[in-house]
Swiss-Prot record:
Primary gene name: accA
Keyword Cytoplasm in annotation: yes
Organism of origin: Francisella tularensis subsp. tularensis (strain SCHU S4 / Schu 4)
Physiological role: Component of the acetyl coenzyme A carboxylase (ACC) complex. First, biotin carboxylase catalyzes the carboxylation of biotin on its carrier protein (BCCP) and then the CO(2) group is transferred by the carboxyltransferase to acetyl-CoA to form malonyl-CoA.
First and last residue of the signal peptide: none
Entry protein name: Acetyl-coenzyme A carboxylase carboxyl transferase subunit alpha
Key word Ribosomal protein present: no
Leading EC class: transferase
Boundaries of every CoA carboxyltransferase C-terminal domain copy: 36-289
Reactions catalysed according to its record: N(6)-carboxybiotinyl-L-lysyl-[protein] + acetyl-CoA = N(6)-biotinyl-L-lysyl-[protein] + malonyl-CoA
GO cellular component, one term: acetyl-CoA carboxylase complex
GO molecular-function terms, A-Z: acetyl-CoA carboxylase activity; ATP binding; carboxyl- or carbamoyltransferase activity
The protein's annotated pathway: Lipid metabolism; malonyl-CoA biosynthesis; malonyl-CoA from acetyl-CoA: step 1/1
Amino acid sequence: MNYLDFESKIKEIEDKITSLSHVFEDEKTEVEIKKLSKKRLELMESTYSKLTDWQVVQLSRHPDRPYFKDLLPLIFTDFQELHGDRTFGDDLAVIGGLAKLNNKPVMVIGQEKGRDTKSKIKHNFGMMHPEGYRKALRLMKLAEKFNMPVVTFIDTPGAYPGIKAEERGQSEAIARNLLEMSALKVPVVCIVIGEGCSGGALGIGVGDRLLMLQYSYFATISPEGCASILHKTAEKASEVTQMMNITSGRLKELKIVDEVIPEPLGGAHRDYETTATNIRKAVAAELKILSEMTVEQRNSRRYDKLMSFGRFKEA
């Protein structure tokens, strides 16, 4: 397992437990392991109860954190992937298709970063091209046609900023998704499972309900990007994070996020199954409520929610 810098003391105890577990078992060893396990639990509860916002960002990027492809088979059944935007190509930074949630059909769409070097390159580190947003929209429109709820999983450092992406209309593709998602006639639930950064996240993040895993973040810019603008150096990222209000708890207080999904003690990477179960229960509960509303009721609430964000004046 990989450890973050603030987890060094936890690592020391877990290394001791692992070392002792390989020793011939006797009563003395068993007692020592129990003592260390209790100490580890107390230390973890203390550590994770007072995380800084920057530490939450670090957890959201943990190399062992479950990605969309890890969670997909644990939450849904009968997944059938659908490919391509029918205009340019098939962007593998986003995966989508038909699936069942508790035996009910849904359209599931998620950003995938990739685990190792080969898969990271394949999925472009979760940074979608315009054809990715158009593929996602095509699947949403298909879901609308067949009256299926849409569930999206957000985990991206941002939309791909390359020249080719700009030439193919990156900003238009994202803007089009914002427009179309705000008016979809089926329930839409969006979940931030790791990084939810900039327009790259918004492009599949407009819906009736926005949920976040406990140790994820949702921001208009990464902490490093913000620090580079304000302080001319990314090294100030940990400082600016505190004033950005980008963690799940802070965004829940600001009413940007509707629900925070709890993670296992120590983060989602320590227990994929429990994380997936928590997500499945949360999404199922939201869809049950939304499915009992009429299209007019849902869209009216969605509109009111979107219009409540921020303030502006006409000059």
